Amino acid sequence: MKKLFPLLMLFGLTLLSCGSDEDSLQKIDQIFNLYIQDSSGKTMLNPSKIGSFTGVSFNDELADKDIANVNFSRKMLEDSTYYIEYIAGATRKFVNDEPDGSKIYRSLIEVSLTKKISDTQNDPVVIDSMEIFYRSSPSVFEVSRVLYNNQLVFTKVQDQPNTATITK
């Protein structure tokens, strides 16, 4: 029994130390959804429709290499609206420290869009830029704002999805 007591005590302390404190977890909110539509509100990201951007690619402009593809997913809502879901993959460079103690990082992505104009022809590739700023603190890592072609298209609103719509 004398040998069992220290083992039970050690086991009990181990269980107590494994408890988690929800406040100590950092919330990650880095999914960004990009919608591209025409002036009438029609989706322009349908991968097979004439008049849409059937070819889309992302290139990391802050990477060490000239060609550094960035992964994204083209997704579709139930109403057949297509959008791009970007989660992560581009280089993040430190920008500055904020007065509240958080840190700001940025990614710069070249967005190449190929528009299908007939069954056999495409328009010349459109090259756009997307600059994503992130805020990092002990409690949260989140997309804070997004510039598309140097125009502010997204500013973070707490508990809202990170979504922007571009009209072309």
Identify what each model region corresponds to.
Residues 36-49:
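Short amphipathic, basic-aromatic surface patches that mediate peripheral association
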Residues 52-118:
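Tryptophan-paired
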Residues 1-4:
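Positively charged n-region of N-terminal signal peptides that target proteins for export
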Residues 119-168:
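Glycine-rich, aromatic-bearing surface loops/beta-hairpins
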Residues 14-17:
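C-terminal motif of bacterial Sec signal peptides marking the signal peptidase cleavage site
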Residues 28-29, 47-56:
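Short coil-to-beta strand junction motifs in C2/discoidin
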Residues 24-37:
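A short, Gly/Thr-enriched small/hydrophobic beta-strand-prone motif that recurs across taxa
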